């Protein structure tokens, strides 16, 4: 596989207004109920060129996780330098067969490879936000996306805070609301762009997605952004969420996996996490009823089909739950320290693993109820998503992803937000028929990992969204913000 950064075999593309322009085209779905335009088996994805010990762009190998008793998970890892820092990046797939999981994993690995830093094009605009505005150029304001607290910068003086007069690199994106090119700070879309001097936040792969068509990739990127925003609003805002009865699912695979988790000692619970938009978001929790080590893990899913959203959340918790007790016991001393000092929650994996400690599970009582507390009965899919009393119908799905995407974008922009798309596709992905994008919705809550990095805690939306959605009568006061690390994986 050619290295997209090789000076000999790379084929860089110019970052121009014309290249950033997006025109949504018809994207017929593969089949009814699907949100893909191609079957995953149709991509030419031999593993060896991507994962081999000599020149594997996605690392030396892909490993089958035979310890998993719920899904046939596969895992790969590659390392990449960002300045002097060497970062390990994991990728993988979670499906019913190893063959499918490998293909999903390679696609995810390529998506991560494309999104970590710009490989197909180079940032050609270096300017301050003030200078861009003086020139009349549209640009995403990092202050709207979210910034770290002053306390973070005092503790980490090498990470300089953003100021509107500071020159930084920008890449071109496309505003789906305004129908025009918009400049995006490079570090907000390429989350490991080299050069610490340009970094004022550490972004993640949130909003990055791949698909067999541009419309498919943008749809899934937007769903991810909406999902994480809703999860954080409900967690930090301690929102009471309606519980979904998974046994009312029309999908046999969903009901069977819920039963399988019960056999392994975990109850699978699911919650309707729609806050601001008529787009189904489901939070899943796998809970040990006995409250022991490996107490609980969380997952989430989003999409126009609530059954698919729940299945996405279920896949995450099914994969993690069966190994959680062992992972908790192996690292118990370090994880238990996090329960008493949240500043020790420093990295991505710390957030979900901390909730393997029994006492951390108490922080989820607002959602799950305290042990022994009488539960409200869960509601069926038809009750929650139908048009009957108490139901909140979701946006209708069509047979074309372009129409689904338009409906979702319209719902988000009607609430006052923009939807910005940056095309991250590498030439090597394009040759496979893939498109990779980064979707930003400035103003929605961003997902961060590390307790000191939680931008969501300082953003206006955390205080206003539940009131605007009719979930409470007033803005969320500071005293009611749940100042506890989120458990998102």
PLM feature spans:
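Helix-biased "structured C-terminal domain" signature
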Residues: 2-489
């Amino acid at each position: 596989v050619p290295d997209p950064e090789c000076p000999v075999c790379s084929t860089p593309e110019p970052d121009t207004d014309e290249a950033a322009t997006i025109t949504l085209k018809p994207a017929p779905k593969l089949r009814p109920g699907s949100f893909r335009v191609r079957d995953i088996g149709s991509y030419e994805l031999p593993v060896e060129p991507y994962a081999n010990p000599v020149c594997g762009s996605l690392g030396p190998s892909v490993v089958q996780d035979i310890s998993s008793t719920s899904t046939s998970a596969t895992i790969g890892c590659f390392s990449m330098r960002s300045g002097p820092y060497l970062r390990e990046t994991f990728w993988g797939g979670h499906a019913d067969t190893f063959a499918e999981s490998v293909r999903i994993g390679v696609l995810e690995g390529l998506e991560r490879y494309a999104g970590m830093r710009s490989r197909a094009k180079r940032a050609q605009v270096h300017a301050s936000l003030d200078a861009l505005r003086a020139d009349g150029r549209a640009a995403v304001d990092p202050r709207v996306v979210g910034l770290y607290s002053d306390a973070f910068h005092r503790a980490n003086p090498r990470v300089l805070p953003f100021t509107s007069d500071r020159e930084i690199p920008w890449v071109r994106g496309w505003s789906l609301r305004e129908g025009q090119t918009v400049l995006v700070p490079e570090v907000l879309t390429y989350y490991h762009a080299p050069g610490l001097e340009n970094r004022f936040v550490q972004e993640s792969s949130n909003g990055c997605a791949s698909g067999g068509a541009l419309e498919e990739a943008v749809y899934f990127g937007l769903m991810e952004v909406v999902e994480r925003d809703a999860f954080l609003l409900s967690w930090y805002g301690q929102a009471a969420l309606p519980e979904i009865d998974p046994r009312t699912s029309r999908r046999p695979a969903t009901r069977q996996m819920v039963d399988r988790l019960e056999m392994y000692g975990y109850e699978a619970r699911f919650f309707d996490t729609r806050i601001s938009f008529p787009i189904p978001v489901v939070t899943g929790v796998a809970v040990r009823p006995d409250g022991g080590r490996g107490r609980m893990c969380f997952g989430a899913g989003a999409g126009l089909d609530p059954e698919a959203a729940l299945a996405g959340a279920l896949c995450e918790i099914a994969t993690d739950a069966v190994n959680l007790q062992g992972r908790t016991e192996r690292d118990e001393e370090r994880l238990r320290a996090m329960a008493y000092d949240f500043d020790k929650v420093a990295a991505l994996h710390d957030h979900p693993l901390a909730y393997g400690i029994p006492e951390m599970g108490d922080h989820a009582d607002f959602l799950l109820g305290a042990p022994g507390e009488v539960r409200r009965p869960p509601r069926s899919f038809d009750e929650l998503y139908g048009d009957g009393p108490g139901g909140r119908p979701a946006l209708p799905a069509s047979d074309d992803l372009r129409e689904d995407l338009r409906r979702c974008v319209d719902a988000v922009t009607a609430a006052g937000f923009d939807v910005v798309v940056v095309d991250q596709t590498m030439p090597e992905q394009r040759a496979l028929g893939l498109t990779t994008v980064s979707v930003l919705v400035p103003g929605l809550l961003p997902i961060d990992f590390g307790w000191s990095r939680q931008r969501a805690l300082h953003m206006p939306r955390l205080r206003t969204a539940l009131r605007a959605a009719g979930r409470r009568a007033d803005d969320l006061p500071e005293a009611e913000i749940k100042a506890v690390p989120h458990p998102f994986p």
